[in-house]
């Protein structure tokens, strides 16, 4: 068996690519702790909140997000352009707002004084004010250095500027989609409030985002040498269910795409509960890509749940499949991983929900949508979009689904110890995990584990390239036995493993070995070699 060259990245047990044998272990998904919504006190211009995009730079959290409100000026502008559709949608003014935080939990929305937003009285616009946090001059930002596998510090951030600010076209989602701004790399979060030369410090990109959209750009795929993005496939790929597509480009100019993640025979597919893949956010995590996928548990029992832009006589599409494009249902988040640049995917932990949606119809996250984590110290802050009701807002005849209340989206926060997504665990009866052959870099072994009620020991054995390779009887490398190993008995995301006579793995260079983990009443999340 060919040995895997390990890097100093964390090796997480999100898949079994490094596991040879794990008899006697349980695989346990670890659901994060929910903290609720970030902005319970909505401002008048925050009729809707969406696309919350947080980053962490120079010791501080920054976020931009989309807000909207109903505005007769925008409705008149859309009418002048001949656009048709849902009246509520055509009357929606869109702006981009800014929030900041020192701890990632408590957020401030400073008055930027950059643009006007409405003042409401008795539900109607009675004036305008600049005392708001709106007017952000870009509508997308992505930390490619943290999440996107980009090592050049000058290209750490990717952002897209806006067009037509201060005009109706600049506040029209429809107009912005047809006339997007320019793409840029940046070395730091742009100080667009205090620095008049902020845009001159950007590195322009002569190109465009993927044809599907810009909200879920992923990063650089070094394996295939291309920029990649993953998101819901375009209609009519919604037939027979929503799915996930991979988009790629060598130069940001020419984009190609194909579907890569589809619901399969193991996913529920009854009219009452038909699973679809609504959306995904993907980040680089060590040597793999980790996806946070929103699974839509759709209800197809009535044609009234179909969108108004599809005529009822076309509901069955080309085949006898009723109500295939429903909007009624809930969403939760599942984990998926890829080691080939997103061409193939692994469904993590038997497809269990990692971030479940709220159990009650009026819970703040009855629909839990995609997001990304930001790691600070030993904690991952996971920011996601949440809706306090069903995904369905209006029926096919455009009447509201909820007759007694108004639902909406908000930004929400969950947290968990760093990288603790899935554990390999045992109870009081111990077990031994055997890895596949690997070539280790020189350095100290570190564990992300909770062994506070038990113990973990590590042994390193030879993995000969030829002849009989028996994972049980292979000789132990001198000084690296279970007996030589000091038990790990704490709870921490980076605990050192020590052998009495071997401070690190420097003596093991050049030949393949296997790690053996003895685990008793403990949870093991991952390991890495810290370079010496």
Which residues does each predicted region cover?
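Carbohydrate-active catalytic/glycan-binding domains of CAZyme proteins
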Residues: 1-532
